[in-house]
Amino acid sequence: MWGRLWPLLFSFLTVTAVPGPSLRRPSRELDATPRLTISYEELSQIRHFKGQTQNYSTLLLEEASERLLVGARGALFSLSARDIRDRTHKEIHWEASPEMQSKCHQKGKNNQTECFNHVRFLQRLNATHFYACGTHAFQPLCAAIDAETFILPTSFEEGKEKCPYDPARGFTGLIIDGGLYTATRYEFRSIPDIRRSRHPHSLRTEEAPMHWLNDAEFVFSVLVRESKTSAVGDDDKIYFFFMEREEGSSSFTQSRSSHRVARVARVCKGDLGGKKILQKKWTSFLKARLICHIPQYETLRGVCSLNADTSSHTHFYAVFTLTTQWKTLEASAICRYDLAEIQAVFTGPFMEYQDGARRWGRYEGGVPEPRPGSCITDSLRSRGYNSSQDLPSLVLDFVKLHPLMARPVVPTRGRPLLLKRNVRYTHLTGTHVSTPAGPTYDLLFLGTADGWIHKAVVLGSGMHIIEEIQVFREPQSVDNLVISPMQHSLYVGAASGVLQFPLSSCSRYQSCYDCILARDPYCGWDSSIHACMVATTVANRTELIQDIERGNRGCEGSRDAGPPPPLKTRSVLRGDDVLLPCDQPSNLARALWLLNGSKSLSDGQDGYRVGVDGLLVTDTQLEHSGNYGCYAEENGLRMLLASYSLTVRPATPAPAPQAPATPGAQLAHDMRMFYVVAIAILGGLCLILASSLLYVACLKGGRRGRRRKYSLGRAGRAGGSAVQLQTVSGQCPGEEDEGDDGEGTGGLESGCLQIIPGEGAPAPPPPPPPPPPAELTNGLVALPSRLRRMNGNSYVLLRQSNNGVPAGPCSFAEELSRILEKRKHTQLVEQLDESSV
């Protein structure tokens, strides 16, 4: 049942967890739209670094030496913090040997991603050395590296107690007063633990009778100097943020016997472990639930701390991803937690594991003294408890069985600062920014899973996203973020390399209104030079105009609202469509169009279509003519962006009158017309004459065709076959005469032609006959006396027999002899068909 109702409950909580009315932004939801969107092509002053490797996820900034140390796969880099592109950088190659990679692959690990030396830890060890640890193909190693020479030492330390085996596992670590505090999954079995090494008293968490950590994935750790301002002599504490699996929850989701929850844990820096109980184990370990928005669907992705050196002002920002069990909706939430709230939870009631019910429940019994999990204070020292080894066994037994607190840690004001839909944040970092007016604001940079950076300022109970920046051309996850206030730069670590770009781009804002609407704590309008400047670069900061809280005050009396846009003219015919372009500079601005300075135009009104790219006027009429102004309305301010003068013409204008032609041009025109008319008349006469001749020819040809008759015969001769073509003027031998004449001799002169193939040599060619007359008595041109090849292997000679002059026999014999000579070896068909004629 709960599985079906969770999507509805998720939507309900999303709507109901909405802040009240606010002057800064709409209150209908927690989602915030970035004011500006800056694509990769629009970026300026961005710097890239990429070596011959990948996975540049470990970053360490050394402000004093102006160096940025980078840990990658099989390499370490020392870059200039001023410009990471500086070619004078140093590099250490720290690869796993082929033998180690082979052993890793034999253990079933991926030799394409896992069986390498991924540098996961990089911290300052002392004044002269750094300390680095790498997975080293599932055999972790650590090394102390000289900061000056930046050369890999010849000796290494075993890292199985300090570094994860798996490069994909969560890891966090700190070096505090020479001691190494790390939290990850250790050993090849991937056991989650919080450990202290390189210390006279090495410590770890308890595993029996119950695990203090259950399938934990660690995200972040930080040292809070609580001893500086403590009135009771309290100890410094290390806080760890992680996700773990909760078994047997007693919440209203009892049907879900196991789910992952966010936790915060803490240990005391001066913890030495127990003397008999909890030997080499933490005696100050406590953990509590961390809640942001919807507990059952929260995954902790990143945490950053601000003012960790002053515990009274220390607070944390955590980013969660909210995902339903079907992953039909994805969002990210940002919550703020005050250190005072966390301290109050750790001094509250405890939980205990109830074996009968197999779940955690609130502990209702008595709590021994000194309070379990507390650090050694001046009060305890006065009572003889100078260290954790002096604590009573009853206290240590209680700590062993009650590591979990009953109350959860809730965000400041009980709700998230931001709920961003369709975005998955992966990392965040923040800094304090003081403004010329005096207030200090928290500025956050949030990295996404697809390579974008969101820059946001915290304003009371909400957040204003100043801009979203696409820092990678190809989508990839942002793995690490580091801020350098001295260099005014943000460093981004990702799989493909390291990026550096400025914390602000104030020069992008061209007017006073645009500068204050951005609400960037780094930017202010300087009226003396009429420019939006970085506040830290201005000598007299008090003269800068800023309004971070509301973002709409300060420019009323200024003349720096920007020059008015030029007036553009448009002229169209009546009934046509016309587009008046107008791009809004801000995602938060609303387009407003005014006609003749007063009439407000709305979408769908009188043929107007208001879009994000301008105003479309459809089916223009005469009343659409006028002056159009495009304004951007944002946060109560109105700015003119474009101005147009539109004229609608009633009809197509008449063509302009032509100038009178000159006498010479008129004469040339008349001659051309005369030639055209003459050619047309002659063409018509030729057509009539040709038609008459064709008609006469057809009549005569029809009468002559009816008086002729051809017959195809066959003569049998020894050794071959013959083709005979007979006209009405003679007959072929061996057949009856079907014509009007009874005479015939069987020769060529008788009107019958026989073609007999054979091997006989042709007679020598006689002298050429006189040419035939050009025209016969019937007026038709004489038929050619030439041999024509028909279908098959037979040849015929077409000629007239009556009332004509036959072609000379010598000419025919000569041509026939030549053709037959070429084909005498060709087999002729014995049976002829009619298609051979």
From Swiss-Prot:
Residues 734-743 have a biased composition (Acidic residues). One of its GO terms (molecular function) is semaphorin receptor binding. It comes from the Eukaryota. The modification Phosphoserine is found at residues 794, 836. Residues 565-647 form the Ig-like C2-type domain. Disruption phenotype: No visible phenotype. Residues 18-673 are extracellular. Residues 1-17 form the signal peptide. Residues 35-503 form the Sema domain. It is a single-pass type I membrane protein. The chain crosses the membrane at residues 674-694. Residues 762-774 have a biased composition (Pro residues). GO terms for cellular component: plasma membrane. Keywords: Cell membrane, Developmental protein, Differentiation, Disulfide bond, Glycoprotein, Immunoglobulin domain, Membrane, Neurogenesis, Phosphoprotein, Signal, Transmembrane, Transmembrane helix. Interacts with PLXNB2. Cell surface receptor for PLXNB2. May play a role in axon guidance. Belongs to the semaphorin family. This is Semaphorin-4G. The gene is Sema4g.
